[in-house]
Each structure stands twice: as C-alpha cells, then as structure tokens.
Amino acid sequence: MIARRTLLASLAAGIAALALTGCQIDTRTPIRVSEILSVAQSGAPVPVSAAITGQFVTEPWCKDEGTMAVETISTPNVPLQLTGCAAAGNGAAGTFQLATNLIRTDGGQSDDVILTNVLEGDTARFAVFPHGKHKDLLSVGLFLNLPQLQAAQQKLLAMPVFKRGGYDGTTNFSFTIDILNDTDKPAKFYLADVSAGGDLPSDEAILTIPPGGQDTVTLDAQTQAKLGTTGWVNFMSMMTK
C-alpha cells in the first residue's frame, strides 16, 4: 500500500534522496494530471522539479556539505541546486531543487531494461507507461540510478567536510508526489501496486481528485524498500476511463 496524506499534513518527499547524507531527507514533487496525460499521448517529456529538504548539524555545515552534494550528484540533464540553509531545531535545514523529467516508456520491460531506457545514465526520473494487461490504466513510476547514487554517497562520505560533520551515511528518507488535477474531469488513481494482469483493488482503494483539486501520495516503508532494491516502483496507477 501507499500512504495518503493531505497537503497541509504531509512530509515533503520525491526523488534522489539516497545520495545525500544526514538524519532525514524528504523530497516532494508536484505533478499535474494534464502532464501525465500529455506525456502518455504525445511522448514528449515534461519537466518536473523535486523540492528536497535535508538535516545538517549547523548552517555552515549545511552550506559546505550542500555545495559538495550538488557538485557530486548533479548531471547535465538532472541538475541539483542548493537553494538555502537555515537554522532549524538543534541543527539546520538545507533546501534543494532537483530538475528532472516525466517521460513515456513501454510497459512489460524487465527491471534492467526499463531502468536503462528511462534513466539513460542520469540519476532520477519519473515515467508514464501502460499498465500490463489493464489497458485503461497508466502507471506513474519513480526511477533511481542506484549505482550512481550509491557511488556519489561514498564519494561524499570520504570528503573531509562530511567526516567533520559526523555523518556515517545512515539516512532516513521519504518520497511524496503532490497530484494536482488541472483538468475538467475527476482523476482516479489506484494507490496499491496493481501487478500486471492481477486483480484490481476494490473501489475503496481508489483515490478520486475532483477538477481543480489536489492530494498527496507518499510511499510507505515497504514500497521504499522495493525502490531501494529494484531501483524503481510504480508510484500510482491512473484510470483513463
């Protein structure tokens, strides 16, 4: 299952948190229903931006370590930007923006093939693809380049500034999508992972967002564990009829 929260109560969540070091990394990515439909129909990528928040020991550490993280993790097609550091609680909070894309890919691919086709050597992307045997469902998946992110993490941990910061690489993280329905029809989603060809969940499992409405979907611990193993997960499935 995938946990659902309102916008006011949700934690920030989204992509690329695996490579940063700290106590807690939260990311949040807004995606519009019209963008999902446009990508599925035209195949033209749509830019999306993930807001990332990380905890640091102090504000100066945040600036130093955040700058190193940006230099280590960014790629030309998926740049990471440090947008601010401020005192928060017993430490400091760093805010980042990661620019990536929502693209279209084919369904029914093996894990290795779909990761290669979606990521194309970059760190993180979202993708829309047909959902197996359920022709009226569009899957929205999150894809991470785990080897690249893990290598970046090890490189960061070896830097003197990170060693002085006292980090051991242990990180808690969360992933959230803010779904914004900017169409004139209700948008309906299955939040449970519907296996290809498997039975659809009951109607009670459907998230309905009215025209002009919005809601938030957060990966639960089980789904995050799968993401950390396979490199991608089906975040949600959108009904097209």
Q: What kind of region is each of these model predictions?
A:
Residues 1-11:
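Bacterial N-terminal signal peptides that target proteins for export
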Residues 31-54:
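Post-signal peptide N-terminal segment of mature Sec-exported envelope proteins
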Residues 24-26:
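Bacterial signal peptide processing site
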